[in-house]
């Protein structure tokens, strides 16, 4: 009897010790969701971001080549939407550093309270001499997202190395106390969890000082997600916020800060070594400098092009630093320009797009949202080369240091290519106008 008593006492004491600090697993709303990835400071650094609706006390990614034998940890921040309900969620970010180039990794995210499903991504090849493939679009909502299934299918077939979403998400991310934003991030997860999803802010992200955009996405910007750049293959990509020119209640200093940063970034991209390695410079932002739509006054507003009171206009920088292509959205349509500066066409030497004399502008804002596509003015402006109101998205390929290619996919026409463009350039430098 004494032996039985001692054994029972020992068992109880051991259980008490083991239970001290043990996980209770009582954590509702701790399942990871809204998973998406982006490039870090280098393209073999991948940032993985996701949400939970309770604090999991840890942010962990298990990953590897075929098997998940590695682990990385990060941090989580509490984001509270500015709406009436003040809904909150924990947004987790983990950085996977110094991955192997041109390698497929499998991963899942989570904590002791639960893991996501398994995803994979492929890091880009090292260096500049490889075929870069991208999907580009703007203005995609959680309703009427015509292009989403096509993009999901292409991503699953490994057609893209990067996705550029050129502003306006969900319509809007803050709607219904940010529930629409949550649903949109779930919808794009099949894309954004497998292909780096690079973004810029649009006018529909403005609410509460762009808080949903800034908190939900993790871009490699110097101070925030509002502007940044990254190098991929033979291309230097630059993302800017056109919205700092329109929502000045958040401070004119934002315009100055971005302008100064952009000038410095483009100057660095134009050093002989950098321009030799990555000759193509592509800038993207939400509101276009040029468009010919008739539904509102936006196409006649020139704040980003000429600046406020003639200061901090972005178009002269495009010329000074030889930006090759500028990509916009905002208008729910597709439009391609001839080489263009200050409303004047500067065609190339042997054809419009062979050694063009100015940047080419592309508007690709017809991915699909609850707002309809936007009609055009007639006749077309002299600088407008092609335009369409079909729902769709843009494919881009950078073949090498001299040739890049764009094509517009029409979802209305079941994936038919309705426009295509080769740009051939043998010397990348400031334009001589």
Language-model features: where?
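C-terminal structured "cap/appendage" subdomains that terminate the fold
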Residues: 380-381, 390-392
């Amino acid at each position: 009897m004494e032996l039985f008593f001692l054994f029972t006492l020992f068992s109880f004491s051991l259980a008490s010790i083991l239970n001290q600090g043990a996980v209770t697993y009582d954590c509702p709303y701790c399942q990871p969701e809204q998973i998406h990835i982006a490039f870090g400071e280098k393209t073999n650094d991948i940032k993985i971001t996701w949400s939970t609706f309770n604090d999991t006390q840890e942010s962990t990614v298990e990953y590897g080549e075929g098997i998940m034998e590695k682990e990385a940890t990060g941090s989580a921040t509490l984001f509270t939407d500015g709406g009436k309900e003040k809904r909150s969620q924990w947004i987790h970010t983990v950085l996977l550093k110094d991955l192997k180039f041109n390698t497929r990794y499998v991963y899942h995210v989570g904590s002791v309270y639960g893991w996501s499903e398994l995803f994979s991504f492929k890091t880009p090849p090292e260096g500049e001499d490889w075929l870069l493939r991208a999907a580009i679009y703007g203005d995609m909502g959680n309703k009427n997202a015509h292009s989403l299934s096509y993009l999901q299918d292409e991503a699953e077939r490994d057609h893209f190395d990067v996705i550029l979403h050129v502003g306006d998400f969900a319509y809007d991310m803050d709607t219904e106390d940010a529930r629409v934003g949550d649903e949109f991030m779930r919808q794009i997860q099949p894309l954004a969890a497998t292909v780096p999803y690079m973004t810029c802010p649009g006018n529909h992200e403005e609410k509460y000082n762009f808080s949903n955009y800034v908190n939900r996405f993790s871009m490699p910007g110097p101070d925030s997600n509002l502007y940044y750049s990254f190098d991929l293959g033979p291309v230097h990509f630059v993302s800017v916020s056109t919205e700092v020119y329109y929502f000045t209640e958040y401070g004119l200093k934002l315009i100055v800060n971005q302008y100064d940063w952009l000038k410095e970034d483009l100057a660095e991209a134009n050093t002989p070594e950098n321009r030799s390695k990555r000759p193509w410079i592509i800038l993207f932002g939400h509101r276009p400098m040029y468009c010919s739509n008739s539904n509102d006054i936006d196409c006649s507003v020139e704040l980003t092009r000429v600046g406020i009171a003639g200061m901090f206009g972005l178009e002269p920088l495009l010329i000074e630093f030889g930006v090759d292509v500028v990509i916009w959205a905002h208008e729910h349509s597709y439009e391609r320009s001839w080489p263009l500066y200050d409303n004047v066409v500067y065609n190339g030497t042997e054809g419009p797009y062979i050694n063009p004399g100015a940047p080419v502008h592309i508007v690709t804002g017809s991915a699909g949202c609850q707002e309809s596509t936007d009609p055009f003015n007639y006749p077309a402006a002299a600088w407008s080369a092609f335009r369409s109101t079909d729902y769709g998205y843009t494919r881009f390929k950078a073949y090498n240091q001299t040739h890049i290619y764009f094509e517009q996919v029409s979802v209305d026409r079941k994936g038919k290519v309705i426009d295509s463009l080769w740009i051939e350039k043998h010397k990348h430098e400031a334009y001589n106008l």
